[in-house]
Structures are given as structure tokens and as C-alpha cells.
């Protein structure tokens, strides 16, 4: 076995170049952001939340039979470590091995922005951001489709399934999905009754694994041959934050041959899912228990779209897809031979240069995380084309009508196109992400003064900002809900709260210079007065003298939060005395190497600290120290020397990129802060 250490987070297409092959060899590549991930049979994967125009699995197998260059079909999103294991009893001479990068890959000290201090830990912390924005920002054209369209149908390699947007818009229920499939290797997979996200009834049909084509590392316990396997959730195996129930297995008394066409149908009926193979019923799968969690899944066990995608290293062709209603009417037909299929199933090639939340996961354009990205990119790579590309990408999906008119999706998937915006209405969740997106635009303008680049988007930006103003509660003056959306969800804190109100005041202030530069003085005045009114409301309604800081919200006056303190300071609502008092109050949130998010949170060994909101706090501490000469040194050092230092001080878990959510830890023990998915939202912050 060979173990490769790339030294820091990298992303791209894995490749190997050989100069001598004694006979056909099978090589297993395994990837991990941390070294310890390589000890796991499936690495630090799979990633089953989104397709991401990348490999969902962190293990892939290569069959090398000739000398020369071999490259993976899939992008591996982000990793520092890689192992290479020879599976066959033969030999191979390797000339080179590595990743064909999908983005910029420059040493941190050679970037346009780089910080050097007398403290090596701080230097390494700052470098985390420069690393992440290089691997998480992807150039247009560098993320091709994960499907291939042929004259026989869609050639689909094993990955998280991709769902039909047409099926979502049809609101199909109690239907029969039928299709033709040819297994090239291992198996073929499909869904029915699914959300646009890959969650819902999932079926996998395995082949007979012929000796001349099967990989030696196929897990035949998880994937027995000639078997129909079913799971009702995300995948066949657990992913760290997406647990799944146990699989159901239906062994077949027939041989499922590879390189032969098979006809499959799955019918959603009252007593379960009826599955036929070549006209013979092979299983009746009982309906899963009803679920109250409709955040991503279909609202009914009988309703939802369909999708396709098999498991690790499997390949199949899917064609002649047909959906028939319970009354026998055909409601959908697709030979799967047109390039339009890629758009419908959300796997079209990337057509914008954009920044994702992270290279490995979620590989979505999260507009809330975008704010962090702007700040970090400004201090490191200065690749402004990624920022304007992300702005254009998000705004192209802007909602025109309805209660959320003006909003944009909070987590646009790679591979989608605006014509299917309504199939994935993520704008209904975490409404304060709209504010963070607007704040990111304001910061971009502050850094660049790019009037020309933003002018064509000004009407859309203004429309979103005006839409958010309607979410100010007229009775409290705080940010809450609108008449059409009275109870929205937020990320930073509850409605009528210090965090969401402070953020929106901050956002309004940032947009004033942009409005003035666009010659829109009336709008600039409105934004300015809105920000002023929000600051007054925070102090009038949420400053709690007995608590000596800002209350979490009107509904929870006895609690306070890290984000409420941060945004009260960043918005300018807090004066010097209020800021000093709030900083002292942080000691009550202190936990391990960081701070709890909310005062009422219970401490436990599984509590996950949050670098994302802690980044807002760190910035607030720096700014308040400069503006009001507050004594914020202890709190600042606690974050730098604890939370962020834990990302760089243990080489077994350090990837050279920032973490999303380390668990409670002290930063010194062997197990300290070892859990952390690298995402762009988690950067070191500050100018």
C-alpha cells in the first residue's frame, strides 16, 4: 500500500501514470481529509446529500491493463490524504500519481494576500482560508457532468442518485416507473417517491459479478450478487450527519447478467412498492413508516419524483424511462438520449465560475456561506471572478412571484439550470441567508467598487433587499416574518431576535454605498433609515440590563447567544459599555476551545462548536476593540488559540483547510477536535 500526503487540501481528478504493467491490475484509491479516514473501509464518505458533480464515494477502483495515463471519471472534492492498494496478485510500475486540479492551487505564501506574524499558529490559521477558497471555488467548465449521454441511453456510474425535476413539477403519485437498463459492472440503482434531494425509496439491483469484470474489493456482505437491495432514506450506508435505517435484502433465484438489457418496473401501491424484473415480480417492499421530516423528502410515501444512480464502482445504462399513472395514463416518457436529460436530472456541466461551501461537501452554492467566502477571498486569492460568478449564478434563480418573491435559493446545486428553479424551492428555508448573501454583495462592492459588474444585477439586488424589508415586524421594529410568511426559519437566531435584526441592520448599511453609486438615492435613503430603525429597536427591545447583554429574542428574554452579541456589535447597535458588558458575558458561554452558541444549550461530549458563527464573533471582537477600546483580548485569544488552533495543531486531523464543526475539545489530547468537515463557511475571519 502507498499513502500519499498532499500536505494540504486538494481537489481534482485523481490520476495514475504507469510505465510497466505485468498483467491487468486492480488498484483501490481511498481518500480522506484526515489521515485517520484511511483506516475506514469507506474513507470519510460517502457523501449522499447531493450529487455535487463529483464522486459521492471516497473509495474507487481502477482496472489498469495498459501502460500510460489513467484518470478517474469523477472529481474528488477535497482531501489531503490518499492511499493506493494493489488488489490483484500482479505488479505495476507507477511513474506518477496525483490530482488534476479543478481550481487554483497556489502555495499560501505566494497568494496576493498573505499574513506573516511572529506567531506560527496564527500564520497557519490564516492560511486555512486561502487554501479553502482555492479548492472550493471552481472554474466554469472544470466540473463536467457526472452522466454520459449516448445513443443507447444515459451511462451512469455509481454515485448519489440524481432526480428528475420534471417528476417534482408533475407532483406524481401512485405511479409505475419503468425503464430499460444494462449493467456494465456491478449493479443499477433507482428511486421512486423521492424528493429532489436524494432521499426516499432507493432500490439497487446487483449483478452476478462475473469473474472477468468484478472488482476484488466489492463488499459482498453489503452488496450480495443477484439481489435487490432497498433502503428508504439517503443511501445503503450511514454518512456522518445523514444516518440511514437498515437495508432490506431480496435474494433472487435468477441470474442478473451483465451486458444484457433488462426491463425494470416499480409500482407505488397501497401495500408497498411492487418491483418487476423482465416481467416477473421479484419483490413487494413494504412501505416505510410515515415520516414527519419533510425538509428534504417527499411529503408522502406515495408521491415524489424518480431518479437514478447506483453504488460505488458500479456502472449501468438507463433508457426508455416511462411513468404511468394509476389509471394507466402515461405521464412521462424519456429515451434518455438527449443532452436535455442532464439539465432535467441536475447533472449538467458547470456553466459559471462559482464558490461552493466546501470542496468535499456540501458542494452547493450556499448563499449564507458566501459572505465568509467574499471576506476570505479578498484577503487571499483576490479571484473576484468567482464572486461575481457566484452572484450571477444565484440571482439567475431569483423567484418572481409568490410569498418569497425576490428571494434566491439558499443552496443551489451544481448541475441545475434556472428553468427548473421551482423544482427545488430552497428559498423557503433559513431566510437570514438572504441577508448574508446581500451582505456579501455589499462587501464585494466595498472591496472592489465594481459598479460595472453589479449594475446589470442592481434591479435583482434591490428586489431581494426590498423583499427582506417586509420581514420587519411593524409592532416590534425587529426582524421576524412577513404577512405572507409569518414564521420563517433562520440560521443565526430566532425571529424578533438580536442576531437576525443586527445582521439585517449591518446588511442595509453595506448596501447604502452601492445604491448611491447606482444613482438610486431614494433607495439608499430607505436602506439607511431602515438600518437606523433596526439598531434603535435592538436597544429598545432587546438590551437587557439585568442580563448585562442582549436578549436572544422577545420570546426568550432570559437567554442570550454568541450570534446575538456578535451582530449587535457588528451592526453598531452596541455602544462601548454595552459591548464591554457583552464580551464579559461570553465567559458564561465558554466551553472547551470555543463558545456555546446559546446560553441555554446543554454541555455534552457531543456538543458541536460552530466556527461559522464564531467567525462573526471574532470579527466583532476585533472591530469593537478598535472602535471602543474594549478589553476583548481574552475572548479573541480563546478563539484563536483554541477553536482555530485545533484545526492546525494535530497533524492526524489537520487537512490544511478549515473545519465546519469540531466537537467540544481542549485542543491538546489525542482526540481533541478531530471531527471536522472542511467547508468554506468556516474561515478565519477579519481584515
Tell me the role of every PLM-derived stretch.
Residues 1-357, 405-409:
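Extracellular/oxidizing-compartment recognition motifs
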Residues 198-202, 366-422, 433-438, 442-687:
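Active-site core of glycosidic bond-cleaving carbohydrate-active enzymes
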Amino acid at each position: 500500500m502507498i499513502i500519499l500526503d498532499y500536505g494540504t487540501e486538494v481537489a481534482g481528478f485523481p490520476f495514475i501514470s504507469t510505465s510497466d504493467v505485468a498483467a491487468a491490475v486492480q488498484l483501490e484509491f481511498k481518500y480522506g481529509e484526515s489521515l485517520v479516514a484511511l483506516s475506514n473501509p469507506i474513507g470519510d464518505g460517502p457523501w449522499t446529500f447531493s450529487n455535487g458533480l463529483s464522486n459521492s464515494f471516497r473509495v474507487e477502483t481502477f482496472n489498469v491493463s495498459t501502460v500510460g495515463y489513467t484518470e478517474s471519471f469523477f472529481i474528488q472534492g477535497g482531501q489531503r490524504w490518499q492511499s493506493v492498494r494493489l488488489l490483484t496478485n500482479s505488479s505495476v510500475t507507477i511513474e506518477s500519481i496525483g490530482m488534476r486540479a479543478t481550481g487554483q492551487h497556489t502555495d499560501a505564501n505566494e497568494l496576493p494576500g498573505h499574513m506573516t506574524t511572529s506567531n506560527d499558529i496564527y500564520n497557519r490559521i490564516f492560511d486555512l482560508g486561502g487554501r479553502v477558497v482555492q479548492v472550493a471555488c471552481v472554474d466554469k467548465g472544470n466540473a463536467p457532468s457526472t452522466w454520459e449521454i449516448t445513443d443507447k441511453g444515459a451511462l451512469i456510474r455509481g454515485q448519489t442518485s440524481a432526480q428528475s425535476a420534471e417528476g417534482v413539477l408533475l407532483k406524481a403519485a401512485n405511479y409505475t416507473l419503468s425503464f430499460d437498463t444494462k449493467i456494465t459492472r456491478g449493479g443499477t440503482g433507482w428511486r421512486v417517491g423521492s424528493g429532489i434531494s436524494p432521499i426516499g425509496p432507493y432500490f439497487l439491483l446487483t449483478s452476478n459479478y462475473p469473474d472477468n469484470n468484478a472488482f476484488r474489493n466489492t463488499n459482498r456482505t453489503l452488496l450480495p450478487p443477484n439481489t435487490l437491495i432497498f433502503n428508504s432514506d439517503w443511501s445503503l450506508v450511514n454518512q456522518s450527519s445523514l444516518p440511514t435505517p437498515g437495508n432490506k435484502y431480496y435474494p433472487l433465484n435468477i441470474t442478473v447478467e451483465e451486458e444484457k438489457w433488462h426491463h425494470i418496473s416499480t409500482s407505488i401501491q397501497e401495500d408497498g412498492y411492487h418491483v418487476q424484473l423482465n416481467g416477473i415480480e421479484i419483490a413487494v417492499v413494504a412501505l416505510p413508516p410515515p415520516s414527519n421530516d419533510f425538509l428534504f423528502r417527499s411529503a408522502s410515501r406515495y408521491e415524489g419524483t424518480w431518479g437514478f444512480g447506483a453504488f460505488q464502482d458500479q456502472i449501468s445504462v438507463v433508457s426508455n424511462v416511462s411513468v404511468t399513472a394509476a389509471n394507466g395514463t402515461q405521464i412521462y416518457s424519456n429515451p434518455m438520449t438527449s443532452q436535455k436529460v442532464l439539465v432535467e436530472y441536475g447533472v449538467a456541466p458547470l456553466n459559471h465560475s462559482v464558490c461552493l461551501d466546501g470542496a468535499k461537501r456540501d458542494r452547493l452554492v450556499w448563499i449564507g456561506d458566501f459572505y465568509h467566502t467574499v471576506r476570505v477571498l479578498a484577503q487571499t486569492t483576490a479571484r473576484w471572478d468567482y464572486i461575481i460568478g457566484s452572484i450571477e449564478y444565484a440571482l439567475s434563480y431569483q423567484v418572481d412571484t409568490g410569498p418569497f418573491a425576490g428571494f434566491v435559493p439558499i443552496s443551489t446545486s451544481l448541475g441545475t439550470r434556472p428553468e427548473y428553479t421551482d423544482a427545488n424551492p430552497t428559498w423557503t428555508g433559513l431566510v437570514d441567508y438572504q441577508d448574508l448573501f446581500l451582505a456579501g454583495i455589499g462587501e464585494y462592492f466595498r472591496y472592489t467598487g465594481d459598479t460595472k459588474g453589479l449594475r446589470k444585477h442592481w434591479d435583482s439586488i434591490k428586489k431581494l433587499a426590498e423583499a427582506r424589508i417586509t420581514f420587519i415586524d411593524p409592532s416590534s421594529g425587529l426582524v421576524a416574518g412577513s404577512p405572507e410568511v409569518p414564521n420563517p426559519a433562520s440560521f443565526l437566531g430566532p425571529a424578533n431576535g438580536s442576531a437576525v435584526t443586527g445582521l439585517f441592520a449591518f446588511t442595509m448599511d453595506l448596501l447604502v454605498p452601492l445604491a448611491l453609486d447606482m444613482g438610486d438615492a431614494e433607495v439608499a435613503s430607505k436602506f439607511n433609515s431602515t438600518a437606523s430603525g433596526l439598531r434603535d429597536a435592538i436597544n429598545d427591545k432587546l438590551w437587557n440590563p439585568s442580563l448585562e447583554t442582549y436578549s436572544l429574542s422577545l420570546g426568550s428574554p432570559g437567554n442570550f447567544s454568541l450570534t446575538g452579541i456578535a451582530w449587535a456589535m457588528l451592526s453598531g447597535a452596541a455602544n462601548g459599555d454595552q459591548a464591554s458588558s457583552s464580551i464579559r458575558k461570553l465567559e458564561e458561554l465558554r466551553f472547551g476551545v470555543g463558545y456555546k452558541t446559546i446560553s441555554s444549550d446543554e454541555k455534552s461530549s457531543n456538543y458541536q462548536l460552530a466556527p461559522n458563527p464564531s467567525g462573526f464573533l471574532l470579527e466583532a471582537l476585533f472591530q469593537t476593540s478598535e472602535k471602543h477600546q474594549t478589553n476583548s483580548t481574552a475572548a479573541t485569544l480563546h478563539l484563536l488559540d483554541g477553536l482555530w488552533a485545533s484545526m492546525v495543531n494535530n497533524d492526524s486531523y489537520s487537512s490544511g483547510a478549515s473545519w465546519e464543526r469540531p466537537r467540544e475539545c481542549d485542543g491538546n489530547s489525542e482526540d481533541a477536535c478531530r471531527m471536522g468537515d472542511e467547508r468554506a463557511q468556516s474561515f478565519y475571519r477579519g481584515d
